[in-house]
C-alpha cells in the first residue's frame, strides 16, 4: 500500500489568529500600488492583479507556481499598513480585554489566589473533556470590576467603547481616546500565562494580533475581474475596496514622512480604519456602507460568507444539480398515488443511463431508431475506448438523424446508453419548503402530454401543495443502487403514515371526501354500478343486486365501496357527520354516522373524512397497519376514483343559493342578534353606573370587555345553529362542511347568518379617532356595532362601517400570518442545525455523533410515533374490536 493511501483521522481542529510574521511569510508579493493593469492590459507588478498572486487571464503564467488558469490555485500578497488598525471582527473582544487587564503591566487584574483558583478549575474541566474557555467570561467580568492592579499596584482606568472601533480611557470626568497603536501596546504587554485565563490559546494567537499592522491580500482567483460586453474590465468588489485601502495607506505614509499636522494624520488614519472596517464587513452597525459608483453597496468579506446567499448556505449546504426539472403542478385523480405525470418535453431532456445486455439490446435498438427527438428515444451513447497507454476513456456521442442508423447496427453488449425518461422509472419528487421527511418522496413516472407535472390529490397534504401556481422539482436517480434505494425507502405508499403522530398524512381530500359520502349514501342502477366498478379499475363481478324496486335492480354504494376494502378488515367508528348525540344509538343511528365494517364489507354507515381522509382516516390507518402499505395504496387509488365517478354520476355543485334560508330562520337570527345587542347595552349601562361585578383577577374594564365578547361570541354560535337547523341534508355547502371535505359550519354561519365580532389584538376594535372608532358613532360609545360587531352576513352584504372593521381584522390576520411564517422558519432552521447529528441508537438511547447520550430512553417511553396511533401508544378499543371480530367471523 502506498504511504499516502493510509486512512487518516482528524484529531482536533484549532482556530488561531495570523501574526504579522505569518502574513508576510505566506505572502508572495508586497502590494504597493493601487493600479491594476498597464496601458497594454497586462497586470502591473506590485499591483493588486500582480501575476505572482495568481492568473485569471488565459495565456498568462503565474510567476509563483508557473501554473496557468485552472491549475494555479492563487497566492496571497500583503499590504504593510502605515499605522496599526483595529480588526472590526474583534472589536468587542478587545473591549473585554482592555477592561480586564492592567494597562501598565498587562496582567489580568485579579488576585493570585483567584488566578490559581481559575487555572485549577480550567485544568479540571479539560481533564473531564469539557471546554476550559467557558470560565473565561466569568473571569473577564470579575477582572473588569477592579480599579487597582493587584500585581503592580497601578491605577486601572475604566474603558468606554464606542462602536465600531473607538475606545476611551475614563479618568474621573475626563476621557482620553486610545489610538489603535496604544491599544496594541497594552495588548502586547499581556503575558502568555495570562492568555489562557482570557480564553486565548497563546500557541496559535496573541491578543495584539487583533490589531492589524499587516493586511493579507487575497489571491486574484478569489476576486476575478470580468470583461463586459463593451470590452471594458469590471473589477471585483474586494479589488475596489483594496484599491481604496492602498490609496489611503500611501497618503497616510506620505503625510507621516512629510511631517504633516496631527489633525491631517488622524483624519487619514480614521479613513484607513473605515476602509478596512468595510473591507471586512460592509454591514457593520454604526458605519455607512461603502458603495459602488452606481450606489449599490459593495459585497465584501462578511457578506460573501454569512446569510442565505453566503458561501456556506448558498454554495456548500445547497447546490444546483443536474438531472433535475421544475415546472408548475396540476391535479390528476386518475394517476396512482405512487405515480407522477411528467411532460413529454421534460422526459426527452432528462435521461437514465442503461447498460446494454443481451436481454434489452432489441429494445434499445428501437429506442436508438427513434433518436433524440422522438419519445421514447436515446440522447447519447457512451463508448469506452482504450488509449495508447492502456487507459480506458469514455466518449459520449450524441444521437442525431445522421448517425442513429449506424448506432442501431453497431450497438453491442457492455455499452451504456442515456435513454429518455419512460413510464415506470423511479424519480424523486419535491416541493419547497422541505419542512419534513415527506416533502421529498419517490414516484414512478407516467409520461403525459402538455407542460405540467401531474400527481394524485391524495399526496397534496404531505407536500402542502395546491394548484394555484405551485411549482415542484423532479430529480432522476442515475444508478441502480439509487433507484432501488428510492423505491424501497422513499416510495409514496411507504409514507402514508406520518412519523409525527402515527396517523395517515396521505389520504382523501375535498372532492374525494364528499364523493365518498355521496357514494356510500346512495343507490345505483346496474349501468351506473358497472361504470363505478370500471372507473375504480376493478375487474371483479358486480354480483347480485342489493334490492329490486319497480322491476329495477339497485346496487347500494356501500356494497360497491366494499369491493375496494381488503377481506378480513373489521372496524367500528363514528363518521365525521356524527351529530354527537348525548346517548349514541350506535347501529340505530338515523344519520347513518356509526360505521361498521365486517370482514371487508361496509355493513353500515357512510364514508367521509373520518373514513379515509388525510390525517383522520380510520379505515386507511387500519389497512396500512394491518394489511400493509401496498394494500392501502390499492384501496386509496380505487376508492378515490370510485368517489369521483359517483360525484360525476350524481352531480355535485355549490352556489349562492346554498346559503338561502327561509324567512322564519332569518327572523329567528335577527331576534338573537337584537337580544345580544341589548345584552351588550345592559353591560355598558351597568359599567357606567358602577354596578358591574368584575371577574376574578381582572379590572373593571377588562371584565366589561370579557362579558361583551362572551355575549357576542355566543350570539354568533347560536345564529349558526339556527342556520344549520334549516340547511337540509342535500345542501351541498353544508354537506362539504359536515363530511370534512372543505370548510366548516362557522364559514356557513358567516355566509348565511352573521359574520360576528371582529377581533384586533385579541379584543374588540378600539383604535381610530379620539373617543370613538369612526366618525359615524357617538363619542364614548361602547355598544356592539361601534366596536367591530358585524351583524350582517356575507350573502346579504356588509354595511360600510362593518366592512371597515372587517378589513381591520383581515389586515391583522395577514400580518400575523407573515410574521408567524418567518418566525417558525427561523426556529425550524435553528432546531435542524442543533439536532442534525442526533439519532436513536439500537439500544434505545438517543446519542449525538460523539456518542454522548441525550436521552436514556428515546422519547422517555421508547414509543416510535410513526407506530403509535394518533399519539396513543396502544389503542385498546381497536385491539378488542379486532379480536372479537376475528372470532365472530
From Swiss-Prot:
Record: residues binding Mg(2+): 466, 468, 470
Cellular compartments annotated:
Cytoplasm
A GO BP term here is: DNA-templated transcription
The record's section on Pfam families has: RNA_pol_Rpb1_1, RNA_pol_Rpb1_2, RNA_pol_Rpb1_3, RNA_pol_Rpb1_4, RNA_pol_Rpb1_5
GO terms of molecular function: DNA binding; DNA-directed RNA polymerase activity; magnesium ion binding; zinc ion binding
The similarity comment for this entry is: Belongs to the RNA polymerase beta' chain family.
The protein's name: DNA-directed RNA polymerase subunit Rpo1N
Give the species this sequence originates from: Methanococcus vannielii (strain ATCC 35089 / DSM 1224 / JCM 13029 / OCM 148 / SB)
The encoding gene is: rpo1N
Amino acid at each position: 500500500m502506498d504511504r499516502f493511501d493510509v486512512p487518516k483521522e482528524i484529531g482536533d481542529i484549532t482556530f488561531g489568529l495570523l501574526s504579522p510574521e505569518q502574513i508576510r511569510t505566506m505572502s508572495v508579493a508586497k502590494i504597493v500600488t493601487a493600479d491594476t493593469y498597464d496601458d497594454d492590459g497586462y497586470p502591473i507588478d506590485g499591483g493588486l492583479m500582480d501575476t505572482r498572486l495568481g492568473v485569471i487571464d488565459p495565456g498568462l503564467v503565474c510567476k509563483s507556481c508557473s501554473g496557468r488558469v485552472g491549475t494555479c490555485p492563487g497566492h496571497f500578497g500583503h499590504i504593510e499598513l502605515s499605522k496599526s488598525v483595529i480588526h472590526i471582527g474583534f472589536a468587542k473582544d478587545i473591549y473585554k480585554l482592555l477592561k480586564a487587564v492592567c494597562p501598565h503591566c498587562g496582567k489580568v487584574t485579579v488576585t493570585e489566589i483567584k488566578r490559581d483558583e481559575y487555572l485549577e478549575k480550567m485544568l479540571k474541566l479539560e481533564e473531564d473533556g469539557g471546554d476550559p474557555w467557558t470560565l473565561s467570561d466569568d473571569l473577564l467580568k470579575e477582572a473588569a470590576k477592579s480599579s487597582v492592579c493587584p500585581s503592580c499596584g497601578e491605577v486601572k482606568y475604566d474603558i468606554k467603547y464606542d462602536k465600531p472601533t473607538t475606545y476611551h480611557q475614563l479618568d474621573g470626568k475626563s476621557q482620553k481616546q486610545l489610538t489603535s497603536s496604544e491599544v496594541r501596546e497594552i495588548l502586547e504587554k499581556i503575558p502568555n500565562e495570562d492568555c489562557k485565563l482570557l480564553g486565548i490559546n497563546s500557541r496559535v494567537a496573541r491578543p495584539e494580533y487583533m490589531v492589524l499592522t499587516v493586511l493579507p491580500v487575497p489571491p486574484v482567483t478569489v476576486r476575478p475581474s470580468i470583461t463586459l460586453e463593451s470590452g471594458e474590465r469590471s473589477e471585483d468588489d474586494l479589488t475596489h475596496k483594496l484599491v481604496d485601502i492602498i490609496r489611503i495607506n500611501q497618503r497616510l505614509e506620505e503625510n507621516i514622512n512629510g511631517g504633516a499636522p496631527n489633525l491631517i494624520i488622524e483624519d487619514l488614519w480614521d479613513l484607513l480604519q473605515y476602509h478596512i472596517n468595510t473591507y471586512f464587513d460592509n454591514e457593520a452597525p454604526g458605519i455607512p456602507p461603502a458603495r459602488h459608483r452606481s450606489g449599490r453597496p459593495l459585497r465584501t468579506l462578511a457578506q460573501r460568507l454569512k446569510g442565505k446567499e453566503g458561501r456556506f448556505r448558498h454554495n456548500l449546504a445547497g447546490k444546483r444539480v443536474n438531472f433535475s426539472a421544475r415546472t408548475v403542478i396540476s391535479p390528476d385523480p386518475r394517476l396512482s398515488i405512487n405515480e407522477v405525470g411528467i411532460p413529454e418535453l421534460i422526459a426527452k431532456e432528462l435521461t437514465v443511463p442503461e447498460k446494454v445486455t443481451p436481454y434489452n439490446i432489441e429494445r434499445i435498438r428501437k429506442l436508438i431508431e427513434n433518436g433524440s427527438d422522438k419519445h421514447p428515444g436515446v440522447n447519447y451513447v457512451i463508448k469506452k475506448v482504450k488509449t495508447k497507454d492502456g487507459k480506458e476513456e469514455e466518449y459520449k456521442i450524441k444521437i442525431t438523424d445522421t448517425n442513429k442508423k449506424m448506432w442501431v447496427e453497431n450497438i453491442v453488449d457492455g455499452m451504456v446508453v442515456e435513454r429518455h425518461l419512460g413510464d415506470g422509472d423511479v424519480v424523486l419528487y419535491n416541493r419547497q419548503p422541505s419542512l419534513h421527511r415527506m416533502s421529498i418522496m419517490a414516484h414512478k413516472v407516467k409520461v403525459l402530454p402538455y407542460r405540467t407535472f401531474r400527481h394524485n390529490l391524495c399526496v397534496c397534504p404531505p407536500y402542502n401543495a395546491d394548484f394555484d401556481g405551485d411549482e415542484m422539482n423532479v430529480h432522476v436517480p442515475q444508478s441502480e443502487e439509487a433507484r432501488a434505494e428510492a423505491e424501497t425507502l422513499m416510495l409514496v405508499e411507504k409514507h402514508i403514515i406520518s412519523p409525527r403522530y402515527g396517523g395517515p398524512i396521505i389520504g382523501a381530500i375535498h372532492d374525494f371526501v364528499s364523493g365518498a359520502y355521496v357514494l356510500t349514501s346512495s343507490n345505483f342502477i346496474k349501468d351506473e354500478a358497472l361504470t363505478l366498478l370500471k372507473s375504480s379499475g376493478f375487474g371483479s363481478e358486480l354480483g347480485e343486486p342489493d334490492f329490486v324496486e319497480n322491476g329495477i335492480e339497485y346496487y347500494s354504494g356501500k356494497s360497491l365501496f366494499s369491493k375496494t376494502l381488503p377481506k378480513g378488515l373489521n372496524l367500528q367508528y363514528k363518521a365525521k357527520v356524527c351529530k354527537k348525540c348525548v346517548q349514541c344509538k350506535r347501529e340505530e343511528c338515523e344519520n347513518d354516522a356509526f360505521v361498521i365494517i365486517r370482514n371487508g364489507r361496509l355493513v353500515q354507515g357512510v364514508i367521509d373524512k373520518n373514513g379515509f381522509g388525510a390525517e383522520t382516516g380510520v379505515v386507511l390507518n387500519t389497512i396500512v397497519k394491518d394489511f400493509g402499505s401496498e394494500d392501502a395504496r390499492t384501496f386509496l387509488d380505487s376508492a378515490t376514483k370510485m368517489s369521483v365517478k359517483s360525484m360525476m354520476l350524481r352531480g355535485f355543485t355549490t352556489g349562492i343559493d346554498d346559503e338561502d334560508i327561509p324567512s322564519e330562520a332569518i327572523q329567528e337570527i335577527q331576534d338573537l342578534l337584537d337580544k345580544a345587542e341589548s345584552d351588550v347595552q345592559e353591560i355598558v349601562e351597568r359599567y357606567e353606573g358602577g354596578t358591574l361585578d368584575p371577574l376574578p383577577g381582572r379590572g373593571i374594564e377588562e371584565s366589561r370587555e370579557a362579558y361583551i365578547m362572551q355575549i357576542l361570541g355566543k350570539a354568533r354560535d347560536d345564529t349558526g345553529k339556527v342556520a344549520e337547523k334549516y340547511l337540509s341534508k342535500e345542501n351541498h355547502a353544508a354537506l362539504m362542511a359536515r363530511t370534512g371535505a372543505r370548510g366548516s359550519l362557522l364559514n356557513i354561519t358567516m355566509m348565511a347568518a352573521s359574520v360576528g365580532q371582529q377581533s384586533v389584538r385579541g379584543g374588540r376594535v378600539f383604535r381610530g379617532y379620539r373617543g370613538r372608532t369612526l366618525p359615524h358613532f357617538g363619542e364614548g360609545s361602547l355598544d356592539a356595532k361601534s366596536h367591530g360587531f358585524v351583524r350582517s352576513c356575507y350573502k346579504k352584504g356588509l354595511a360600510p362601517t362593518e366592512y371597515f372593521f372587517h378589513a381591520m381584522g383581515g389586515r391583522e390576520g395577514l400580518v400575523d400570518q407573515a410574521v408567524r411564517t418567518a418566525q417558525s422558519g427561523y426556529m425550524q432552521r435553528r432546531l435542524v442545525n442543533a439536532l442534525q447529528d442526533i439519532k436513536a441508537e439500537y439500544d434505545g438511547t438517543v446519542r449525538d455523533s460523539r456518542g454522548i447520550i441525550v436521552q436514556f430512553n428515546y422519547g422517555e417511553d421508547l414509543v416510535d410515533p410513526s407506530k403509535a396511533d394518533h399519539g396513543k401508544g396502544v389503542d385498546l378499543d381497536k385491539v378488542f374490536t379486532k379480536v372479537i371480530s376475528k372470532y365472530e367471523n
